[in-house]
């Protein structure tokens, strides 16, 4: 099987990471290996890349793409939320020169119908990035309470019709369990009023995004990964994160802002008593986005935002 995945914001990633020839870099979401290959081409001597991915198909594809780099590549099957444990196992805590996290679903996962990520093809309601995980989209939709389904659609998909869609899902599953993406698309079309279905692209887009985030606990993984990644970096090391929707971007922006803060004392204190010092320097005051040319060539880049920070201590 050919693993098709175009690395987004590649030029910008290299620009903010500034790979040093003998540096050690970690790609927390190696995917097809596109970003890692570009980083490896900048390295020499003892320079190496550690690539993580929870999807075995992605890891196998990365292995094929990066095979020519030999032992300068270490591939590990793991969710990026476990960066701390992986780096500790390799004896590299506090020694990594740069970390990249490219969050979200890959082009390959979207194109592979049987994975159930896309609303454009009928397939099993799966949506797992790790095919060995217990929770599928079908299991969630057939077992979760109506209120929980509505919360997921509202919080993770920013879906204005979340409550109504959840009601329709629960009514439908009482007759027969939901098992196919096509069934879910039909339910969403029925739940959203005709006039509203014409707004903002495909009517199922937000629901599918929300379910994918919930099934894979993507926001929880990101919140765990960010502090672990910072700890894994050497002083002067850089953390770059590519996000694809506002929920992720807010988490990254907030984390960087928090770590960049200095004194936490009340403003009326004459001298600092807390001793807190900034842990990072923010490199991207505003998120970097793709060029018009990249967005035309790669639709996935249209919603991509890159933020980066450098570890001070």
UniProtKB/Swiss-Prot annotation:
Family membership noted in the UniProt record: Belongs to the methyltransferase superfamily. RsmH family.
SUPFAM superfamilies found in the cross-reference section: Putative methyltransferase TM0872, insert domain (SSF81799), S-adenosyl-L-methionine-dependent methyltransferases (SSF53335)
Designated gene of the protein: rsmH
Protein's name in the database: Ribosomal RNA small subunit methyltransferase H
Alphabetical list of InterPro entries matching this protein: RsmH (IPR002903), SAM-dep_MeTrfase_MraW_recog (IPR023397), SAM-dependent_MTases_sf (IPR029063)
Biological role stated in the UniProt entry: Specifically methylates the N4 position of cytidine in position 1402 (C1402) of 16S rRNA.
EC number(s) per entry: 2.1.1.199
Enzyme class per UniProt: transferase
One term of GO molecular function: rRNA (cytosine-N4-)-methyltransferase activity
């Amino acid at each position: 099987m050919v693993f098709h995945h175009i690395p987004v914001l590649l030029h910008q990633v290299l620009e903010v990471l500034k790979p040093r020839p003998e540096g050690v870099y970690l790609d927390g979401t190696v995917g097809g290996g596109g970003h890692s290959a570009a980083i490896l081409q900048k390295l020499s001597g003892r320079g190496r890349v550690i690539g993580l991915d929870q999807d075995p198909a992605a890891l196998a594809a990365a292995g094929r793409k990066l095979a020519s780099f030999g032992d300068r590549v270490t591939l590990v099957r793991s969710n990026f939320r476990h960066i701390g444990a992986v780096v500790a196992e390799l004896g590299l805590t506090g020694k990594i020169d740069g970390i990249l996290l490219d969050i979200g679903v890959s082009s390959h996962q979207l194109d592979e119908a049987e994975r159930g990520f896309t609303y454009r093809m009928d397939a099993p309601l799966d949506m797992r990035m790790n095919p060995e995980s217990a929770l599928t989209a079908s299991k969630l939709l057939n077992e979760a309470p109506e209120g929980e389904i509505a919360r997921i659609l509202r919080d993770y998909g920013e879906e204005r019709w979340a409550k109504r869609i959840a009601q329709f899902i629960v009514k439908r599953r009482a007759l027969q369990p939901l098992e196919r993406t096509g069934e879910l698309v039909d339910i969403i079309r029925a739940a959203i009023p005709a006039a509203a279905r014409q707004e903002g692209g495909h009517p199922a887009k937000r629901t599918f995004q929300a379910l994918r985030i919930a099934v894979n606990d993507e926001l929880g993984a990101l919140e765990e990964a960010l502090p672990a990644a910072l700890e894994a970096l050497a002083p002067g090391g850089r953390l770059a994160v590519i996000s694809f929707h506002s929920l992720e971007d807010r988490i990254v922006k907030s984390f960087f802002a928090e770590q960049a803060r200095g004194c936490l004392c009340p403003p009326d204190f004459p001298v600092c008593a807390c001793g807190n010092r900034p842990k990072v320097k923010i490199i991207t005051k505003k998120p970097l986005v793709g060029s018009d040319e990249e967005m035309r060539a790669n639709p996935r880049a249209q919603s991509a935002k890159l933020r980066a920070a450098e570890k001070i201590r």
